[in-house]
């Protein structure tokens, strides 16, 4: 295959000519997409791949890899079009001064399709990230495999997947979906730690609407099938729905601020002034829990009161809203938050909530981030739909995640902690280090109404006034069992505290656990109930 012809007017036999030729080639690499293709990209409200990379990284920090790489294929006339870069921008730079590897697929060149050289460039930057111990951020905007290059495209996809797996739990991996991502291409983002999508711009699916209509007869739009809203609210594939591309890039930067560069590093710390006295803001929690156990409250209020500056970066916000997960800081140090949300399905655990929380706990554990758990859970959601879809196996994932975690685990029971859900939500029995309860906590096998109906069924049937008798027995049950004190007597909770003391108690607990060392039995790997 012949080299690129020398531009007219450049004498490459002189040093000046060689430098001029280099500048020409580099300029072509930076403008690989045609003006028409770039204009179409901008008309859709989308940046080009290079614009995205430069917007994401610190100014002047980008170091590009393989800028002059070109494909080697001669099939179907490809030899007549060999743009520099081959449709993907790769390299490394910094975000807030910390090293980050990045690749961005360029839809203006071959529709961002993945061929041999394209794939090799991504593999190289992933290898660099793993070797140097820095996060890798992938910006996806691609038409899929480059059909003209045949099976070699599929081979490079698998090479990328393998590296996603090998890097899992070693370096943070974040995928930004900023356009189409279809077919086999979706599996690389699915293997990463966080997937971010852009509203009305991003689409992910294995098979598109046309194929689905042909095979099943279903009619569905791109947005309904695999849009950002669908994957954030229904499938749970995505962790954030951005309003536009800049919002997506900013959320990725925010995520990185909570994550260490790799599993051997500690998360970044921001120095703050320690406050170990109870403040007026802390005292607001003393009146948060309603007198009625059936009245909801917003768990975000509790979360905000214990975090620095009430800053909480929630992930997976629209999926399984009955459980809340996200990142914050306590004394400038990152923590992961897992909390039941009484405002949604009364905070019950279902399949989606269990898997959402399990994944988050395991992510925190992989990257040395302590987990704070706030518990108000009446149990697992009942119903044939849950049972037939595998709540036993899939709910066990959350139990597994807590039991295998070796990072500091601090649990606060604010109200209900019933049945198996009490065990699953970061209980002392699964290995939590510090377990606290508010005086409003109700720790029991089940709620008072259900317990009374089972324990006193005959007495209620024989009573002349079953409603009054049931009310009396419910009160007796609540006074006797539905409280935190039996658990405290047995050491299942380490202390019953005023709600206003929560922040200070968490600060003290995390300080004490800062040098925690825990080991698990040697094994190749566990067999999580997938």
Language model region names:
Residues 1-530:
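Ligand-binding clefts of soluble mixed alpha/beta catalytic domains
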């Amino acid at each position: 295959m012949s080299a690129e012809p020398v531009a007219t007017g450049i004498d490459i036999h002189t040093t000046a000519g060689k430098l001029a030729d280099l500048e020409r080639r580099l300029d072509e690499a930076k403008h690989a997409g045609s003006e028409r293709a770039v204009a179409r990209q901008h008309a859709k409200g989308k940046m080009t791949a290079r614009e995205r990379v430069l917007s994401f990284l610190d100014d002047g920090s980008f170091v590009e890899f393989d800028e002059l790489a070109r494909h080697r294929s001669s099939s179907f006339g490809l030899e007549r079009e060999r743009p520099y870069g081959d449709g993907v921008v790769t390299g490394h730079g910094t975000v807030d001064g910390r090293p980050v590897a990045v690749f961005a697929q360029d839809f203006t060149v071959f529709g961002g399709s993945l061929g041999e050289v394209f794939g090799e460039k991504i593999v190289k930057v992933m290898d660099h990230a793993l070797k140097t111990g820095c996060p890798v951020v992938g910006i996806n905007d691609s038409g899929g495999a480059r059909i003209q290059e045949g099976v070699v495209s599929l081979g490079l996809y698998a090479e990328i997947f393998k590296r996603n797996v090998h890097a899992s739990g070693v370096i943070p991996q974040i995928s930004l979906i900023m356009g189409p991502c279809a077919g086999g291409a979706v599996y690389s983002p699915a293997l990463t730690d966080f997937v971010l999508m852009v509203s009305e711009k991003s689409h992910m699916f294995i098979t598109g609407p046309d194929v689905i209509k042909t095979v099943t007869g279903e009619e569905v739009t791109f947005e309904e099938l695999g849009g950002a809203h669908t994957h954030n609210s229904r499938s749970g594939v995505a962790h954030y729905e951005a309003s536009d591309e800049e919002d997506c890039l900013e959320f990725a930067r925010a995520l990185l601020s909570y994550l260490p560069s790799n599993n051997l590093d500690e998360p970044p710390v921001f120095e703050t002034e320690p406050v170990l006295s109870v403040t007026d803001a802390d005292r607001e929690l003393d009146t948060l829990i309603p007198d009625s156990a059936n009245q909801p409250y917003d768990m975000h209020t509790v979360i905000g009161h214990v975090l620095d500056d009430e800053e909480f970066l929630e992930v997976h916000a629209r999926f399984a809203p009955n459980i809340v997960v996200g990142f914050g800081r306590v004394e400038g140090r990152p923590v992961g938050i897992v909390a039941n949300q009484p405002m949604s399905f009364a905070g019950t655990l279902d399949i989606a909530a269990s898997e959402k929380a399990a994944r988050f706990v395991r992510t925190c554990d992989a990257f040395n981030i302590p987990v704070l758990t706030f518990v108000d859970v009446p149990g697992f959601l009942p119903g044939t739909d849950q049972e037939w879809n595998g709540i036993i196996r899939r709910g066990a994932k959350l139990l597994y995640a807590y039991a295998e975690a070796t990072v500091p685990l601090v649990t606060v029971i604010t109200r209900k902690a019933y049945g198996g859900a009490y065990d699953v939500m970061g209980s002392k029995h699964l290995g939590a280090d510090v377990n606290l309860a508010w005086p409003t906590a109700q720790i029991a096998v089940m709620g008072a109404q259900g317990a009374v109906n089972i324990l006193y069924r005959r007495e209620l049937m024989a009573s002349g006034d079953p409603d009054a008798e049931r009310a009396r027995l419910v009160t007796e049950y609540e006074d006797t069992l539905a409280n935190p004190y039996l658990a405290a007597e047995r050491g299942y909770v380490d202390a019953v505290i005023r709600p206003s003391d929560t922040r200070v108690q968490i600060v003290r607990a995390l300080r004490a656990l800062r040098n925690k060392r825990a080991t698990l039995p040697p094994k190749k790997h566990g067999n999580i109930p997938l």
